[in-house]
C-alpha cells in the first residue's frame, strides 16, 4: 500500500493546558472544523468526544490522552490536505504523568491558556515538560469572551512566568462580550467569523480605525522577530523595512521549530472564533516528523552504542508504546507512535525491553471514541495495536533484525499510598487482575502487598489519582473496594558519618557461621539522583572478594524496611573497609547478616532522621478569605513562598506544605471560602521532618512492634 499523506504533511501535536482553560472544548472545535464530529459536544453537557471515560464526563476534566486523527486544508482551503494526529492531554496535576508520556511522542504542541486565569501552576508544569522534550509550541489564548479576559496580560505572563518569547500573530478585536474577531498581523486584515455557520465561514475586512495604531506596533514587533531567523532576512529588513508574507511565514516556522519563539493566537472556542486560525498555524508553523531531530536509542551491539532512526518508511521499523488502555469491546489497546519504517497487520515486532517477540493482530486508528481498522502503519503514524500481551508503557517495539531501544520515559515515584480490599472475598482475584491491568497502563501507579499485614497497598501521585483508579476498578472490572486512610511515603536518612563493626557468629559444634565487617556510613543528598552507593576499600583480603556482594545485599535488604520507623532508607554511601573471616565457617549468608547488623547499628549512631514529601501548593482565593486561608496553611506547617494579585480581586498564594498535612484540605478550603477558592498541588521535594512530628511517627512504629 502506498502512503496516502506525504510525511511532510503530517503534524503530531498535543493540545495541552491547565484544568478549565477550555482545552477539551478547543479540541472538540478542532474535530468539528476538520469534519470528524458533526455535532459539537460540550463539556458542560458531559458529551465531549475526547473525554471518553465515564469519570471524565462526570468530572468535566480530561484524564486519559485519547489519540485522534483528523485532516485540515486551511480556513480558506489554501493548503494541501494535512493529517493532524492529536493527543489530548490532561490538565490536572495528579495526571502530570499522562502529559509527560504524551510530550514524549509529540512533534509539536498547542498550549491553551485562559484569557482570565492566565498562566496557572499546571501550565508551568506542562511547560517544563515541553522544555525537557524540546517540543516546539504555539499558544492559544482562549475564553476571550469571558468577563475579565485580558490578552495582553497573558502575553506578559508567558514571558515572566514561563520564560517563553511570545510573538502574537493576531491581536483581539474587543474583549469580553464585545470580542468580535482578530486582526491578522501578517496580512493586516481583520477577521470576523460567521456565528450562523458555527464559525465555518468568515470574512476579511479592514482593520477597525481604533486598532490601527496597536496593530502596526505589534506587526512591527512580529516582523522584527521574523527578521532574526536568517542573516538574509535581517539584511532585507534593514534595507526595505519590510518582509513579504511568505518570508514572514517561513521565518516564523523556522524560529518555532528551533524553540526560539512561541507564536500566539487568541479566540473563544466556545463561541467558535479563532480555533480555525490556530489550525492554520499548526500546519504553517509546527514541524512535520522529519523537521525534528531523528529519535535516539541504544543499539543491540556489545558496546550498547547510541544509534538513531531517521523518519522514513525505508528505515527499519521502530515505535514507542506510550499508552496502554483497556477497551471493553476489543480488550488491550497499545497506543504507539511510529518513528521509522512500516508495520503491517499480522506481522511480528520485537520488544527489546522485555526481550520478546509479539505478533500484531489488528491495527486500529482512533477517532476519539470510534475506531477504523488499518492494514498498515507508517512513519509518523499514531495508532493502537490490539492484543499485545506483554507491553508496558514506555517500551520500544522494533524490527527483530535491526534492534534499537528508544529512550525510556522516566516516571516519578508515588507520594501517597492507600490500603485497598475488595468488599467481598470472592472479588479478591478479580481485584488482583484489575489492579495489575491498571498498573500496566499507568507507570506512576504501583501495587504491592504489605509483608506484615498482608494488605494490598496502592500508591500514586495524589488523592484524586487513586480515587479515580478505585472508581475505574468498579466501573470497568466490576470490583467494589474499601479503601483505608491515606499513608504518606516517608523516607529515612542519616546526617553524620560513622564507622561501625558488624559480627555474625554462630559456632556450636559442627559447621558454624562467621561473618565480620567494618562499614563506614556517610550521608549523601537524599534529593540527588543517586540514593545509595556501595564502595569496597578492603586491603589485604581481610574480607574475601566473593563475600563483598553479600555484604551489599545485606545492607540493601535492611534499607528497604528501614531502621527508625520502617520506611525505606535513602541518601547513604556505605564503604566496606575491613573485617575478618573464617576458612571453614564463613559463607555468603554470614556476611550478608554481618553487613545488615553493621548497617543497622551504624544507622542508629549516625544521627538518623525522617524525611517527608513536601508539596508545592497554589491557592487562588477572593481577597476576603485571604487571612483564613493563610492561617490555615501555617497551621498545616506550610511555608508561604509568595503571593500575587490576579484580576477581579483574587489573590494567589504559593506555599510549600508537607503532604501529611494536606489530607482533607479540599473540604476545609471550600468551607473557609464558601466554595470560592481553588487549589492545586504537586510534589516538590523530600525534606527533613521537625523533631516533634518525627518522634510521634517513630513511637507509633515502636508501639506497633511492641504489640506484635
Curated annotation (Swiss-Prot):
Keyword Transport recorded: no
Subcellular localization: Cytoplasm
Entry keywords, A to Z: Cytoplasm, Elongation factor, GTP-binding, Nucleotide-binding, Protein biosynthesis
InterPro entries: EF-G-like_DII, EFG_II, EFG_III, EFG_III/V, EFG_IV, EFG_V, EFG_V-like, G_TR_CS
GO molecular function terms noted in the UniProt entry: GTP binding; GTPase activity; guanosine tetraphosphate binding; translation elongation factor activity
Gene3D superfamilies, alphabetized: 3.30.230.10, 3.30.70.240, Elongation Factor G (Translational Gtpase), domain 3, P-loop containing nucleotide triphosphate hydrolases, Translation factors
Keyword presence, GTP-binding: yes
Any single GO BP term: ribosome disassembly
Every tr-type G domain range: 8-290
Matching CDD domains: EF-G (cd01886), EFG_III (cd16262), EFG_mtEFG1_IV (cd01434), EFG_mtEFG_C (cd03713), EFG_mtEFG_II (cd04088)
Coiled-coil portions: none
Signal sequence, start to end: none
Binding site for GTP: 17-24, 88-92, 142-145
Entry's Gene Ontology cellular component terms: cytoplasm
Alphabetical list of HAMAP family matching this protein: EF_G_EF_2_B
Entry similarity comment: Belongs to the TRAFAC class translation factor GTPase superfamily. Classic translation factor GTPase family. EF-G/EF-2 subfamily.
Biological role: Catalyzes the GTP-dependent ribosomal translocation step during translation elongation. During this step, the ribosome changes from the pre-translocational (PRE) to the post-translocational (POST) state as the newly formed A-site-bound peptidyl-tRNA and P-site-bound deacylated tRNA move to the P and E sites, respectively. Catalyzes the coordinated movement of the two tRNA molecules, the mRNA and conformational changes in the ribosome.
Name this polypeptide is given: Elongation factor G
Species name: Psychrobacter arcticus (strain DSM 17307 / VKM B-2377 / 273-4)
Gene for this chain: fusA
Amino acid at each position: 500500500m502506498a502512503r496516502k499523506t506525504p510525511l511532510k504533511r503530517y503534524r503530531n501535536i498535543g493540545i495541552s493546558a491547565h484544568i478549565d482553560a477550555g482545552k477539551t472544548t478547543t479540541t472538540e472545535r478542532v474535530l468539528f472544523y476538520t469534519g470528524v464530529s458533526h455535532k459539537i459536544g460540550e463539556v458542560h453537557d458531559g458529551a465531549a468526544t475526547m473525554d471518553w471515560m465515564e469519570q471524565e464526563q462526570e468530572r468535566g476534566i480530561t484524564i486519559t490522552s485519547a489519540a485522534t486523527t483528523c485532516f485540515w486544508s486551511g480556513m480558506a482551503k489554501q493548503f494541501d490536505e494535512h493529517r493532524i494526529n492529536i493527543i489530548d492531554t490532561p490538565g490536572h496535576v495528579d495526571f502530570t504523568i499522562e502529559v509527560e508520556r504524551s510530550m514524549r511522542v509529540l512533534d509539536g504542541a498547542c498550549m491553551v491558556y485562559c484569557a482570565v486565569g492566565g498562566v496557572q501552576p499546571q501550565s508551568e508544569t506542562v511547560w517544563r515538560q515541553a522544555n525537557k522534550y524540546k517540543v516546539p509550541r504555539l499558544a492559544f489564548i482562549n475564553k476571550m469572551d469571558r468577563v475579565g479576559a485580558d490578552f495582553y496580560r497573558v502575553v506578559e505572563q508567558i514571558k515572566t512566568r514561563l520564560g517563553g518569547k511570545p510573538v502574537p500573530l493576531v491581536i483581539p478585536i474587543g474583549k469580553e462580550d464585545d470580542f468580535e474577531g482578530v486582526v491578522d498581523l501578517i496580512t493586516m486584515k481583520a477577521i470576523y467569523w460567521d456565528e450562523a455557520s458555527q464559525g465555518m465561514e468568515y470574512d476579511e475586512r479592514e482593520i477597525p480605525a481604533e486598532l490601527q495604531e496597536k496593530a502596526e506596533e505589534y506587526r512591527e514587533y512580529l516582523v522584527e522577530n521574523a527578521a532574526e531567523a536568517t542573516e538574509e532576512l535581517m539584511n532585507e529588513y534593514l534595507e526595505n523595512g519590510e518582509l513579504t508574507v511568505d518570508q514572514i511565514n517561513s521565518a516564523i516556522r523556522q524560529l518555532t521549530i528551533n524553540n526560539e519563539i512561541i507564536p500566539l493566537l487568541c479566540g473563544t472556542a466556545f463561541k467558535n472564533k479563532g480555533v480555525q486560525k490556530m489550525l492554520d498555524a499548526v500546519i504553517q508553523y509546527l514541524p512535520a516528523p522529519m523537521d525534528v531531530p531523528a529519535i535516539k536509542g541504544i543499539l543491540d551491539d556489545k558496546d550498547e552504542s547510541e544509534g538513531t532512526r531517521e523518519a522514513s518508511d525505508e528505515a527499519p521499523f521502530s515505535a514507542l508504546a506510550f499508552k496502554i488502555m483497556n477497551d471493553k469491546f476489543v480488550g488491550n489497546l497499545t497506543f504507539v507512535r511510529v518513528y521509522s519504517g512500516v508495520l503491517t497487520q499480522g506481522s511480528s515486532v520485537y520488544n527489546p525491553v522485555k526481550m520478546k517477540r509479539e505478533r500484531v493482530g489488528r491495527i486500529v486508528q482512533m477517532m476519539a471514541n470510534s475506531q477504523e481498522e488499518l492494514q498498515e502503519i507508517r512513519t509518523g503514524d499514531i495508532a493502537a495495536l490490539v492484543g499485545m500481551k506483554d507491553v508496558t508503557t514506555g517500551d520500544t517495539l522494533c524490527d527483530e533484525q535491526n534492534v534499537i531501544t528508544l529512550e525510556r520515559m522516566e516516571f516519578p515515584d508515588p507520594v501517597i499510598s492507600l490500603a485497598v480490599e475488595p468488599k467481598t472475598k470472592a472479588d479478591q482475584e478479580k481485584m488482583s487482575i484489575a489492579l495489575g491491568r491498571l498498573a500496566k497502563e499507568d507507570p506512576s501507579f504501583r501495587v504491592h502487598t504489605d509483608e506484615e499485614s498482608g494488605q494490598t497497598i496502592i500508591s500514586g501521585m495524589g488523592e484524586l489519582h487513586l480515587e479515580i483508579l478505585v472508581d475505574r476498578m468498579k466501573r470497568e472490572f466490576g470490583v467494589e473496594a474499601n479503601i483505608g486512610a491515606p499513608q504518606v511515603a516517608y523516607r529515612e536518612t542519616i546526617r553524620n558519618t560513622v564507622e561501625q563493626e558488624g559480627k555474625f557468629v554462630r559456632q556450636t559444634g559442627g559447621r558454624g557461621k562467621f561473618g565480620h565487617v567494618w562499614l563506614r556510613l556517610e550521608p549523601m543528598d537524599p534529593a540527588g539522583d543517586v540514593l545509595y552507593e556501595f564502595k569496597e576499600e578492603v586491603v589485604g583480603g581481610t574480607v574475601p572478594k566473593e563475600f563483598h556482594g553479600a555484604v551489599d545485599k545485606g545492607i540493601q535488604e535492611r534499607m528497604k524496611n528501614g531502621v527508625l520507623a520502617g520506611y525505606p532508607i535513602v541518601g547513604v554511601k556505605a564503604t566496606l573497609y575491613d573485617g575478618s573471616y573464617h576458612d571453614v565457617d564463613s559463607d555468603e549468608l554470614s556476611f550478608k547478616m554481618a553487613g545488615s547488623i553493621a548497617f543497622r547499628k551504624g544507622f542508629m549512631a549516625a544521627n538518623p532522621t525522617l524525611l517527608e514529601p513536601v508539596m508545592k501548593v497554589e491557592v487562588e482565593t477572593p481577597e476576603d478569605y485571604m487571612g483564613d486561608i493563610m492561617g490555615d496553611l501555617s497551621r498545616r506547617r506550610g511555608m508561604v513562598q509568595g503571593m500575587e494579585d490576579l484580576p477581579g480581586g483574587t489573590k494567589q498564594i504559593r506555599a510549600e506544605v508537607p503532604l501529611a498535612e494536606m489530607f482533607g484540605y479540599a473540604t476545609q478550603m471550600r468551607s473557609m471560602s464558601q466554595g470560592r477558592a481553588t487549589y492545586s498541588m504537586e510534589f516538590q521535594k523530600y525534606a527533613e521532618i521537625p523533631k516533634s512530628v518525627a518522634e510521634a511517627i517513630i513511637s507509633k512504629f515502636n508501639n506497633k512492634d511492641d504489640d506484635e
